[in-house]
């Protein structure tokens, strides 16, 4: 019953018109009125921001803010795979040979997440990593490793929240929400960077358009808090064993080690 009521409320409020109005407001000068309150409520670290709080003209500018030079260091170890975002580590684990994985008591299909069987088959037996971004986090997305971009594509339409309630009651938000996917070949192994849209504001702006990418390079940004799912091919990485659910991560922090072929 709770799941049914939750989904009904989301469907009634999560239409294109509602999303359009909220997006237009966030991009308007009127939204600047609530910036101080927003920064206070979500405890945004203003010392790291590239500009002073009063210099942001809209909520959108604050959401997509850059940081001061040197505030995020990319792990220098050649074999290190790094966090692509500032966020809260949710989980990591094996992708079953059936091309599924379980998180928070819900089973997710890689076929659904990536749109077809051919793409999903590459990751059977591999590893997944999930990182959640709250509205307070820095919203820019960086590459976790170096390699060659093999494909970019978008899937999905409406988006359920990706908070605790959304993960519990939503329609498999990680594989059904609007999502923007970048696949990267790194030394003969494939990784998928799945950027999952949040409720109301689906916008994910791609910044990286070249064929090659360097570890730590900026790739995209969310316009609001959301989630990143990383999928790694079998035998590609070994996740850092000390990672724990709820742990804060920063861009450039080591989350896994590349395994040698």
Curated annotation (Swiss-Prot):
Q: Which residues form the active site?
A: 86 (charge relay system), 142 (charge relay system), 226 (charge relay system), 226 (schiff-base intermediate with substrate)
Q: State the annotated membrane topology for this chain.
A: Peripheral membrane protein
What InterPro entries does the record tag this protein with? PS_Dcarbxylase, PSD-B, PSD_type1_pro
What EC number(s) would the UniProt record show?
4.1.1.65
Q: Which cofactor does it need?
A: pyruvate
List the residues marked with site Cleavage (non-hydrolytic).
225-226
User: According to its UniProt record, where is this protein located?
Assistant: Cell membrane
Which free-text remark accompanies the cofactor? Answer: Binds 1 pyruvoyl group covalently per subunit.
Under the cellular component aspect of Gene Ontology, which terms does the record hold? plasma membrane
To which protein family does this belong? Belongs to the phosphatidylserine decarboxylase family. PSD-B subfamily. Prokaryotic type I sub-subfamily.
- This one is known as Phosphatidylserine decarboxylase proenzyme
